[in-house]
C-alpha cells in the first residue's frame, strides 16, 4: 500500500523533533560547506595558478587520490564501529577542514606553493572526507527512526548534498572579497564551529526507542 505523503511528512517532523536527530542535521548542513568550496575552487586553482596540466590533475585525483579515498571509506567504517560514529565523523570531516586550512596557510606563506604540498593535498584530502562520510552514514542510520526512517535517512543525505551545493554557490561572493588562501582558512573555522553540537548528537536514546518500539 502507498502511504499518504502527509502522514510520512508528519512522521518525519516527529522524528526530527528528537534533539540528536535535529542537531545531527544541523551539524551536517554546516560542516560540508567547505567540501563544496574545495571541489569548485581546487581544479581552477591548480590549473590556472599552480600551472598544472588538466590531464595530470585528473590522473592524480582519479588515481592515487581515488585509491586513498577508497581506503578511507573502509577505514571510516572500521573506526566508527570501534571508536564511535560521532567521534570518527568529526575526525574525518574535521581533519579535512584543518588540512584545507593548512593548505590555505601555505598558499599565503609561499610565493610558490612547494610541489610536495600541492601533491600531498590533492592525494590526501579525499581520504579524510571519505572517513567522515562513512561514519556520517552510520550515524544517520542510527538516528533514523519512526515509520519514516527510510525518508529520514534520505533526508540526511539530501542535507549533506545541499551543504556541498551551498559551498559551490559561495565561490562567487567569496572570491570577490577574499584570496584563495584566505577562503580556505575562513572555511576551516566556519566548518569546525559546529563541534559544540557533537555532544547533542548521541544516538543512544533513539536506538533504545527503536528497540522498544520493535518489541
Spell out what each predicted region is.
Residues 40-58:
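Short amphipathic helix-loop junctions that connect adjacent transmembrane helices
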Residues 17-38:
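Pair of pore-lining "gating" transmembrane helices in MFS-fold secondary transporters
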Residues 71-88, 175-176:
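Helix-to-loop junctions at the C-terminal end of transmembrane segments
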Residues 185-215:
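Multi-pass alpha-helical transporter architecture, strongest
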Residues 1-23:
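Juxtamembrane intracellular "pre-TM" segments in multi-pass secondary transporters
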Residues 130-145:
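Intracellular juxtamembrane helix-capping segments at the cytosolic ends
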Residues 146-176:
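A late C-terminal transmembrane helix in Major Facilitator Superfamily
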Residues 94-112:
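C-terminal ends and interior cores of transmembrane alpha-helices
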Amino acid at each position: 500500500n502507498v502511504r499518504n505523503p502527509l502522514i510520512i511528512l508528519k512522521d518525519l517532523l516527529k522524528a526530527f523533533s528528537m534533539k540528536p536527530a535535529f542537531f545531527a542535521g544541523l551539524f551536517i548542513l554546516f560542516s560540508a560547506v567547505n567540501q563544496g568550496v574545495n571541489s569548485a575552487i581546487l581544479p581552477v586553482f591548480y590549473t590556472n595558478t599552480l600551472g598544472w596540466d588538466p590531464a595530470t590533475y585528473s590522473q592524480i585525483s582519479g588515481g592515487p587520490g581515488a585509491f586513498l579515498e577508497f581506503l578511507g571509506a573502509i577505514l571510516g567504517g572500521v573506526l566508527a564501529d570501534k571508536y564511535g560514529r560521532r567521534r570518527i565523523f568529526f575526525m574525518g570531516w574535521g581533519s579535512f577542514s584543518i588540512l584545507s586550512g593548512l593548505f590555505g596557510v601555505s598558499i599565503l606563506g609561499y610565493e610558490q606553493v612547494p610541489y610536495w604540498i600541492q601533491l600531498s593535498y590533492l592525494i590526501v584530502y579525499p581520504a579524510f572526507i571519505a572517513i567522515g562520510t562513512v561514519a556520517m552514514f552510520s550515524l544517520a542510520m542510527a538516528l533514523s527512526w519512526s515509520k519514516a526512517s527510510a525518508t529520514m535517512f534520505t533526508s540526511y543525505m539530501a542535507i549533506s548534498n545541499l551543504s556541498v551545493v551551498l559551498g559551490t554557490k559561495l565561490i562567487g561572493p567569496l572570491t570577490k572579497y577574499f584570496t584563495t588562501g584566505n577562503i580556505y582558512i575562513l572555511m576551516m573555522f566556519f566548518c569546525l564551529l559546529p563541534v559544540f553540537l557533537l555532544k547533542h548528537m548521541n544516538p543512544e536514546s533513539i536506538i533504545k526507542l527503536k528497540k522498544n518500539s520493535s518489541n
